[in-house]
Regions:
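Hydrophobic-ligand binding "helix-grip"
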Residues: 100-140
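Beta-strand secondary-structure signal
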Residues: 47-49, 98, 120, 134-136, ...
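Hydrophobic/basic alpha-helical segments enriched in Actinobacteria
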Residues: 78-81, 121, 178
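A conserved amphipathic terminal alpha-helix motif
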Residues: 154-205
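Short, intrinsically disordered, mixed-charge
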Residues: 64-72, 126, 181, 185-188
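Short, flexible segments with low predicted structural confidence
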Residues: 33-38, 108-109, 147, 151
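Hydrophobic ligand-binding cavity/cleft-lining segments
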Residues: 1-100
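Beta-strand/loop substructures that line and gate deep hydrophobic ligand-binding cavities in soluble
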Residues: 126-170
Length: 206
């Protein structure tokens, strides 16, 4: 399952202001959403980035294809998106997916925001994490694709696996770096430089 991918990892302890995800719009269904306040342990704010050159797709086109079927960039031998609620076609706010993974890693999520160049998911009750994750693309000296997450562990066992044993953290790293590589393939371009992963670990009271 594991492979060598050129990447640069930066990890920081941060005692400053808590990085917060964007607020949910008033019309977003909050039922079963597992927000940061329901989480356990520290807050992890993570950014995964890759720059793509010589690709054949615009930022808008990339997001449109992924919204139609996230599995076009998912490492489907390891993880697969299954739509549980919503119509086929492009993502819409309120659609729900189960990210099916081996072992205890299955993750139910709901679409809480979409734009022409981004979409954002919130974790639902039963997910190993509590928080949100956003996928976005924009054209900046090539095509920059980013995945940004704001999350705490969903329960004490998840916190042990993620923060203490680091097992879940490495599974997550593999998942999202694989998605970035999938985006590169989707565009038929080439990755410029290394994939970068930045992690801020923030202590949360309570």
């Amino acid at each position: 399952m594991w492979r060598i991918t050129p990447m640069r990892r930066l990890e920081m302890e941060d005692a400053g202001n808590q990085p917060m995800p964007p607020s949910l719009a008033p019309d977003v269904d909050r039922d079963r959403i597992q927000g940061l306040e329901q989480g356990v342990g520290p807050l992890f704010h993570r950014r995964y980035r890759t720059t793509i050159r010589d690709g054949s797709l615009t930022a808008h086109e990339v997001i449109a294809l992924i919204e139609r079927d996230p599995n076009v960039v998912a490492p489907t031998e390891f993880a697969r998106f299954m739509r549980l609620a919503g119509q086929s076609g492009s993502m819409k706010v309120g659609d729900e997916y189960l990210v099916r993974m081996p072992g205890p890693w299955d993750g139910p999520v709901r679409v809480v925001d979409t734009t022409p160049t981004s979409f954002r998911l919130a974790t639902l009750r039963g997910h190993l994490e509590a928080g949100q994750i956003e996928f976005r693309a924009h054209e900046e000296d090539g095509l920059l694709f980013e995945i940004e997450s704001w999350a705490r562990s969903g329960d004490h066992l998840s916190n042990l696996l993620y923060d203490q044993f680091r097992m879940a953290k490495e599974v997550q790293l593999h998942m999202w770096t694989s998605v970035l590589e999938g985006v590169v393939r989707l565009t038929k371009g080439r990755r410029s430089g290394m994939i970068t992963i930045e992690t801020r670990r923030v202590h949360v009271d309570g």
